[in-house]
Amino acid sequence: MSIRRAGTLIAIRELHGIAEFEQVSELFDGIWHFDPDSRPITVELMRAMSHAGNYVAGAYDDAGRLVGASVGFFGAANTLHSHITGAASGHGVGFELKLHQRRWALERGIDRITWTYDPLVRRNAHFNLAKLGARPEEYLPSFYGVMTDAINQGSDSDRVLASWSLSAPHVAALVRGEPCRRPLPADAAVVLADEDGRPVTRDSDASTLLVALPEDIEALRVADPGAAKAWRLAVREVLGGLLVEGGVVTAFHDKAFYVVERPSLGTASSSDRV
């Protein structure tokens, strides 16, 4: 599969050889600067996963340089779990990799892809929810324990599990390039706000709630670790709490707020479901 992005021809294909997996490992190291003793994926594991029929793919520019890669494995029924995806910024490679992954899954009768991401990173939330149409299903506190890579170093590794329903109408529309924006209800209320860079929680009985994120959590971790930790705990409490109660994240508004719909009266919370 080949596409043209920002004037560059990008070819995406499945990978099978050791030399290709070594290129992927180098690409990922260049993005995350992993501790050599705690890499999330190794050359040997990519080889085994590819041989077993899982998803290992790379994106190459017209000069033959690897500019993106993605690794996923079969999980629950009819589900592919995307373990790691990394790409050079600025060329839309990450989006094209996800579309390739979607086509690959649908060809195999898979209708759902899941992955985890840091719920505090605005650009990731916008990409996952607004561009792809995925929806957060579960809040996972300190999912990977304390991480040591250059981006996450020293931070609690809270994640949300994103679920991508590949054949959902809103996903199909986004894939076709059609925006799916719904206006906020007039009574939508902010329950986590950003006030001078600090998180402030608010009470509300509204059915549509907005959960703010910091402008740049990665920069904040370096400039003000205390504020970064305060945001982590606040989002864990507010967004995580709403998901546990059965709230549904329906959008990411204005590149800054999760939009959460409260469950209607009589709807069981996640802890009550069989």
Task: Give the label of every model feature segment.
Residues M1-L45, S50-H51, G58-Y60:
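Short amphipathic alpha-helix that is part of the acyltransferase structural core
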Residues R47-G58, S155-S157, L243-V248, K255-Y258:
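A short helix-loop-beta-strand connector motif used in the catalytic cores of GNAT acetyltransferases and
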Residues V56-G58, G64-F73, H81-H83:
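Conserved beta-strand in the GNAT
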Residues F74-S82, A206-L210:
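A conserved beta-turn-beta hairpin within the catalytic core of GNAT-like acetyltransferases
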Residues H83-G92:
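A short, internal acetyl-CoA/4′-phosphopantetheine-binding micro-motif in the GNAT/acyltransferase core
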Residues G92-H100:
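Conserved acetyl-CoA pyrophosphate-binding loop and the N-cap/start of the following alpha-helix
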Residues A105-L120:
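Conserved GNAT acetyl-CoA-binding A-motif
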Residues T116, H126, G133-N152, A251-H253:
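Conserved catalytic-core motifs of GNAT/GCN5-like acyltransferases
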